[in-house]
Amino acid sequence: MLTLGQFIKAVCSMLGPVLVGVAAGVWGNWRLIFPLYALITLLSWLWMARLKVDESHSEPVGARGVRTLLTDGYILMLLSVIVLSVGFEIGLMTAVPKYLSERCSLPLDRAAMGCSLYYLARTAGTFGGAVVLSRISSRRFLTVSMLLALVALGLFMTAADATVLFAALFVLGLCCANVFAIAFSAALKSAPGRANEVSALMIMGVAGGALLPPLMGVVADLSGQWASLFVPGVALLYMLVASLKLKN
């Protein structure tokens, strides 16, 4: 279910730029997309409000209960994987248009298509991951994915041909599509009796999207856009090491 949820999220991310383009073309102002987003959010809330969820009785989640989880090294490692995976994606998507524009002399609007290509691959990756993860262990899957992602990022940083760069982005999207779901699921399995606290802590990991991009910006200002890509590279390397410690 986590992987399926990530699939739906990836589809929404991929459609975001398309909807903005439609709003600009049809209504003449891309900002008019926000009322549409508000309507979709309202309809989603009304739909969810009608659902009945049977939950077992559990104690309310408190800040103290969440903090105690941080003393568990395994949980802390999985949290850091989620932080870095979200930071990797946001940081990379922030850098891709300018990097492609500088690397291949592409117009910025065409270079920005690299982000849509990444999310297209991520959509395919989450869908495929739901099938593959039912057949092999999440540890092996994550290890192979991170190895391929490192190779793809290395190719992205060294190639100069636009086709090769777009292909590398596509592979990156495929390889990084299921990191969040795997880490989240592993955390829940490690402490099944504290699912609420674990869920609350893992969701906090999305804050990683606000951590890596500023660091990449500092590196880019000091050494250029190419050098800033070493930041997500280090994140991938950490996730590779963490995958080797994942419990089957």
Which residue stretches match the model-derived regions?
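Juxtamembrane intracellular "pre-TM" segments in multi-pass secondary transporters
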Residues: 53-78
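Helix-loop-helix hairpin linking two adjacent transmembrane segments in secondary transporters
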Residues: 4-53
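Extracytoplasmic gate region of multi-pass secondary transporters
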Residues: 73-116, 123-126
